[in-house]
Amino acid sequence: MTHPTELPLSPLSALQFYATAPYPCSYLDGRIARSQVATPSHLINSDIYTELVKAGFRRSGVFTYRPYCDGCRACVPVRVPVGEFAPTRTQRRMWKRHRALVATVSPLHYDEEHYALYMRYQSARHAGGGMDRDSRDQYEQFLLQSRINSRLVEFRDLDAPGGEPGKLRMVSMIDILGDGLSSVYTFFEPDDRHTSYGTYNILWQIEQAKSLGLPYVYLGYWIRESPKMAYKANFHPLEGLIDGRWKTLDPERVDLPPVDAALARAPLPGGHSGSG
């Protein structure tokens, strides 16, 4: 990593921002990516992380980053304003279909059943991508390490006769921010076809945010050119962080430069520009 950039704004002034070396993009084939990383990780508490998320950052374990690619700004941070959210007919149908699932919220913790489901999900959905070979340690580093207010949510069928726990269908990790919930990662039973568990999970998070009095659910990055990201555009209204400002996003008409256009550096929190 090179070129630390200090951010002269308390309490974020203690952080430094680095640009990583180039690496293959995991979203667009043939593209080269870079990330901007916020360090040191032990200083990033929930309040600071909230400000970073509002500036387009995400986390993987204790690694806090945002896209910082040369000549590309395809990744758009998106969030749902829960007070204005209007579900589609399909989303209402998915909500009714899965409402019998029992959601249990707990602190982050390791569970062998969760790990087994994670590996089945990766093998079915992302075979050959590397994550389908994650060890238990890698799984824990990716999903169970956090220095902020994070929760694990498991979704099961109703308890079986005799009190046995119902079948595990889905596991989701979320962060609780000062202004919303942030969806970290979700995996589910890959053998259940056409279930739209991912859609249901976001609907569940929207309802949770409402119940907690939080205005947003942050969905990470939406990439117009990536079919895997298409589902995020189905939640309306959707806000995107473009040129440093959150604005209502029309995925069909959003005015983004083409992937090969020159990168306009998004400002860091407080209006300061970063550098690689």
Swiss-Prot record:
Pfam families: ATE_C (PF04377), ATE_N (PF04376). Keywords: Acyltransferase, Cytoplasm, Transferase. InterPro entries: Acyl_CoA_acyltransferase, Asp_Glu_LeuTrfase, N-end_Aminoacyl_Trfase, N-end_Aminoacyl_Trfase_C, N-end_Aminoacyl_Trfase_N. It is an enzyme of class 2 (transferase). GO terms for molecular function: arginyl-tRNA--protein transferase activity; leucyl-tRNA--protein transferase activity. It is found in: Cytoplasm. One of its GO terms (cellular component) is cytoplasm. Its main location: cytoplasm. GO terms for biological process: ubiquitin-dependent protein catabolic process via the N-end rule pathway. Its EC number is 2.3.2.29. It comes from the Bacteria. It catalyses: N-terminal L-glutamyl-[protein] + L-leucyl-tRNA(Leu) = N-terminal L-leucyl-L-glutamyl-[protein] + tRNA(Leu) + H(+); N-terminal L-aspartyl-[protein] + L-leucyl-tRNA(Leu) = N-terminal L-leucyl-L-aspartyl-[protein] + tRNA(Leu) + H(+). Functions in the N-end rule pathway of protein degradation where it conjugates Leu from its aminoacyl-tRNA to the N-termini of proteins containing an N-terminal aspartate or glutamate. Belongs to the R-transferase family. Bpt subfamily. This is Aspartate/glutamate leucyltransferase. It comes from Burkholderia cenocepacia (strain ATCC BAA-245 / DSM 16553 / LMG 16656 / NCTC 13227 / J2315 / CF5610). The gene is bpt.
